[in-house]
């Protein structure tokens, strides 16, 4: 069903918030297409394609380092804090324990201020040319905020170049895609992949194309969206405050549509008889791996040396590529056995910290394990 309290059964065409599965189902696909066309090289500096990074400590970071999560860029940054009016509340915004002004629980040991406002110059209640970035119902960000995020990333101090999974890496890759293609990334993906592949249930900003009732709700009361149910708006804060189209999250889709992308990849760039990517590009991105982590070029992979830390079933071969998402999603493609495994859920409903059994019980790897065990019989 859609939720614990609902008797509405999930249909095969109902859309889920993919969360970080967006990275490989959207952003990486666009990156591979532009690489295929010779628009950049993996050792190119990202600052060649994002002028805002020139003169910062990110200037020498390469595209390959972003894809491998070895850029030195921090894992996360709370961009949304810049939009909050600090004069609208007293004391701290967060507290480890509830008190008279902190009743809203957002994590196991974290509570947020009950009442706060957004800066009026950055957030409006209605859409306009100056406020086009929709964050939720009756919440529209100023058009300048998206560009300010790139400036903020440029100012964040760079750390060492060890492996550090970071959503910011893929936010930068999305910016690169748009600067090279001269198109919004969602429209680029529609044109190059989603429309010709008949992925009719895949979209950024899904409420522009689908009814709310066709989209599975993600959380019941999001504190940054004034306690509203999130249904059709991306849950990830960074993607939300980019206006819903981001490189790290924002895509909504179905299991059937997601499977098409990974079938395309293990079939060497061909889907339903049409070529979308060269075999050489697919081979490179599917086989290139980091020397210091389990990661591939944008893809996550099994940890063959540590099954406890591996995101995949122990039986999954090292050739497997894919990704997971915070909302309870994953997709894994196995070119060796020619298998595609996709699992979508809204495991963070009603509150992200309430239902962690999907991770604690390793449900996703165990489901994948059943598939491999059946294959071995």
Can you name each region flagged by the protein language model?
Residues 1-9, 42, 131-143, 331-334, ...:
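A short, well-structured edge-of-sheet supersecondary motif
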Residues 1-18, 39-41, 151, 155, ...:
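Short, conserved catalytic-motif segment at the N-terminal edge
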Residues 9, 56-60, 157, 290-293, ...:
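Extracellular/periplasmic catalytic domains that process cell-envelope and extracellular macromolecules
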Residues 17-43, 170-178, 258-261, 265, ...:
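Active-site SXXK
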Residues 18, 22, 27, 165, ...:
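Hydrophobic (often cysteine-bearing) scaffold residues that line and stabilize catalytic clefts
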Residues 42-56, 196-197:
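Short, glycine/proline-biased beta-turn/loop segments that scaffold the active-site neighborhood
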Residues 59-318:
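Short, surface-exposed loop or secondary-structure junction motifs
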Residues 269, 323-377:
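Structured C-terminal helix/loop/strand segments within mature extracytoplasmic catalytic/sensor domains
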């Amino acid at each position: 069903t859609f939720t614990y309290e609902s008797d509405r059964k999930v249909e095969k065409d109902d859309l889920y918030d993919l969360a970080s599965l967006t990275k490989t189902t959207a952003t990486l696909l666009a990156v591979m297409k532009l690489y295929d066309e010779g628009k950049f090289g993996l050792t190119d500096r990202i600052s060649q394609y994002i002028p805002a990074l020139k003169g910062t400590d990110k200037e020498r970071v390469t595209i390959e380092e972003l894809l491998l999560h070895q850029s030195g860029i921090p894992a996360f940054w709370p961009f949304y804090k810049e939009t909050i009016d600090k004069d609208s509340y007293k004391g701290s915004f967060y507290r480890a324990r509830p008190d008279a002004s902190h009743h809203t629980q957002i994590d196991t040991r974290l509570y947020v201020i009950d009442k706060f406002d957004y800066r009026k110059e950055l957030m409006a209640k209605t859409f306009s040319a100056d406020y086009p970035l929709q964050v939720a119902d009756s919440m529209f960000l100023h058009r300048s905020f998206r560009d300010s995020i790139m400036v903020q990333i440029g100012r964040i101090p760079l750390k060492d170049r060890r492996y550090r999974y970071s959503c910011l890496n893929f936010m930068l890759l999305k910016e690169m895609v748009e600067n090279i293609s001269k198109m919004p990334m969602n429209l680029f993906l529609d044109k190059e992949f989603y429309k010709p592949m008949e992925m009719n249930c895949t979209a950024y900003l899904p409420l522009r194309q689908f009814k709310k009732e066709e989209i599975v709700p993600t959380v019941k009361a999001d504190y940054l969206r004034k306690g509203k149910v999130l249904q059709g708006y991306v849950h990830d804060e960074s993607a939300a405050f980019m206006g819903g189209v981001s490189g790290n999250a924002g895509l909504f889709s179905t299991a059937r549509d997601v499977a098409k992308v990974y079938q395309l990849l293990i079939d060497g760039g061909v889907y339903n008889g049409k070529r979308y990517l060269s075999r050489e590009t697919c081979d490179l991105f599917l086989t290139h791996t980091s020397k210091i982590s389990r990661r591939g070029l944008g893809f996550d992979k099994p940890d063959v040396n540590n099954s406890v830390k591996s995101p995949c079933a122990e039986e999954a071969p090292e050739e497997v590529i894919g990704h997971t998402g915070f909302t309870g999603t994953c997709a894994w493609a196995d070119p060796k056995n020619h298998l595609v495994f996709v699992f979508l859920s809204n495991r963070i409903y009603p509150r992200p910290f309430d239902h962690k059994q999907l991770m604690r019980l390793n449900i996703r790897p165990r489901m994948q394990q059943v598939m491999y065990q059946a294959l071995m019989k």
